[in-house]
Amino acid sequence: MQKILISLSVILLLSFCDGNKKNSSFQLKGTLSDSKAETLYLEKLGSSKQVIIDSVILDENGNFEFTNYTPKIGFYRIKTNDKNFAMLVLDSADKVTITGSVKDLGNTFKVEGSPETTIFIEYNNLSKSRDIKLDSLNKEFQVLMETNKMDSIRMDSLSAIFEAPYNSIINRTNTLMVDKISKNTNMYSSIMAIQALDPDKYSDLYKSLDAGLSKKFPNDKNVIMFHEVVERMLSTNIGQFAPEISLPSPDGKEIALSSLKGKLVLIDFWASWCGPCRKEMPNVVKIYSKFKNKGFEIYGVSLDQDKEKWMEAITKDGINWPQVSDLKYWDNVAARIYNVQGIPYTVLIDKDGKIIAKNLRGQELEKKIAEVLK
């Protein structure tokens, strides 16, 4: 039920596209209640920074209009401060009107004249509904844990009971999200929405969105970067030959993935700081012990930054298979090549070097390995 994720938005919003001085028919205006001459800011969003590009003081009736900026397609927000804001997806041809309360922009604002923002809100509402249900389920689980003293066996049993409704909530939301994205493959907002979906499971939808966005926004940097993500994803689909990677081991010796060809190889992406990875590691150790003399090998790739902590985890967890890392965290070259969006993450490669399974863990992984090696 747990996994450390890297948001796809981090990948997609690395570039920062500037807009232009006001030179088109673009409009962004509105009326906000509860106004006391507050200053309202228009901000362009990037992955690591936000830049204020315009500001306006609301008049005595709460009216405002931004007049100094024409946006390129992208993600923006209006705000009074960093805790009171509303997200927008704006384009240069929009004529946008916003209403709501200046005291609570995020929960009260309504927008007209921005098709992209309208779709973005619909996506966001799906995510909010999912998160509310998951939060309620988690609180129920925590209450049962706190009011009942449980051994590990009973704890696992309780977790199994809650896993079904958890998966039901996720699957229901994913079904609705897939349906909406499928109908909006030319909408820029879909870039953010699709990050909630597993690229391995929904590769066809990623391809459709890539095609739609590339046709409509061929020169947009974020769309170009999304295309590159999809290209990497396709190159590591099941049935493809595993791309080569070669990284240093803890002692500095380069170990190439291809050096293990001829064996059934599991690429195991993990990190010492990743709780779910460490929790899964005893199972990986058990699997390795069971199959290592039967033509099975593991190529461990750590997304660590701190070499000492990486080596401590190797020792503490009893890891005795090949381990490599460039100590570059999420910028790890192997993670980029294999389009890793979250850890733990696994890729199973047959003796000929072809990818035969992805993201298996626990009993599913052990069963698949036994099946291939029999």
Feature names for model-found ranges:
Residues 224-258, 321, 368-370, 374:
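N-terminal "domain-start" segment that seeds a small globular fold
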Residues 351-374:
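Thiol-/selenol-based redox modules, centered on thioredoxin-like
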Residues 311-352:
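Short, internal strand/loop/helix patches
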Residues 106, 159, 167-241:
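N-terminal targeting signals for export/organelle localization
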Residues 279-301, 371-374:
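Conserved helix-turn-beta segment immediately C-terminal to the redox Cys motif
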Residues 18-175:
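A non-transmembrane, solvent-exposed segment enriched in polar/low-complexity residues
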Residues 261-262, 269-286:
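Conserved redox-active cysteine motifs that mediate thiol-disulfide chemistry
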Residues 14-16:
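C-terminal motif of bacterial Sec signal peptides marking the signal peptidase cleavage site
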